[in-house]
Amino acid sequence: MKKAFNLTTCEGDADFLADPVETARQLEGYDGIELQVIDDPPGGLVDPALVTGLHMACVPCWYALWTGDEKGLLDEFGTLAEAEEYYGGPLTRDTLLSKFRRDLVWADRLGAEYLVFHIAESRVIESFTEEYLHTDEEICEACAEILDILFEGRKAGPLLLLENLWQPGMNLRRPEITRDMLEAVKYPNKGIMLDTGHLMNTNTSVDTQEQGLAWIHRVIDAHETAGFDLCGAVRGVHLNASTSGALAKRVKEAPPKLEGSYKDRTSKMFFHVFERDQHRPFTAPGVKDLVERLAPDYLTTELITMDQDDRRRKNSIQLNAIK
């Protein structure tokens, strides 16, 4: 099992890679990093030897664009001009695909062993209300379509890992959806990236890490009972904890009033999502046994950190919890 920690190329996040001493300090106990390329890094900053995996672009709201639903775009963005600004180009499928194709280029350039792709979709208001317009089936079908286009003609290459969230898509609440989603993708080198914190977020009764741990085992058990070997399909794990059930219930009962531009509304949404999806070290007794049960090829400590010292401290805490 290879161990990595999450890193982005946002300004300031990966700067330590220019310092070999600090890089070695940050990587203590780890085999590499799982990188998300947001800003193009300066030439030579990211040593391909350090990159274990690459996290593909996260686009929370994309279904209306993909299906050519102009009314859906107007309902979400207010104007088509705002939608074009959000997506960074014309309102076509190619604009969305270009974001993911850029990731494939970077994966090849950096020699990433695996890629992570979110199987989910959520409009801004749905992040608060959790009352969704689209079904798991609709989102998974569209995701499979996207991935089949992106990987068309590829018989081999990086391991493609489908990640669970708590919105519509492959959220692991329904074993038949998990099975069908994995089978729908034609690219052969594939598996699941199970995010433990995201899975905790599917149950708003989870308010402690112990409850979250028990819930994850229940989900695995439910898949086994349904005849699907979830542990066998899980090739990667994003290890973290999110115990925000009470917050989710409170916000759902009294969602905020969303005003201003789409950028203003998404800013409020992202602030809430980071409260909801806490990405803290998962340290409950039994987390080591969970990792051993899942037995992934890749384990990434995916945590929210404030600076280099905070990252190193939290990554160390997470590693110690599974020793």
Residue ranges of predicted features:
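Residues lining hydrophobic/aromatic ligand-binding pockets adjacent to catalytic sites
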Residues: 24-27, 35, 108, 128-140, ...
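Acidic-and-aromatic substrate-binding clefts and catalytic sites of carbohydrate-active enzymes
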Residues: 11-18, 29-45, 60-64, 94, ...
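Hydrophobic faces of well-ordered beta-strands that scaffold small-molecule active sites
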Residues: 2-9, 31-35, 50-56, 115-117, ...
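Histidine-acidic metal/acid-base catalytic patches
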Residues: 1-3, 97-102, 106-113, 187-194, ...
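Active-site acidic/histidine proton-transfer and metal-coordination neighborhood
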Residues: 89-191
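Short, flexible/disordered intra-domain loops and linkers
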Residues: 12-16, 64-66, 70-72, 125-135, ...
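Generic structural signal for well-ordered alpha-helices
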Residues: 21, 41-46, 100-104, 143-151, ...
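N-terminal pre-domain/capping segments
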Residues: 1-102
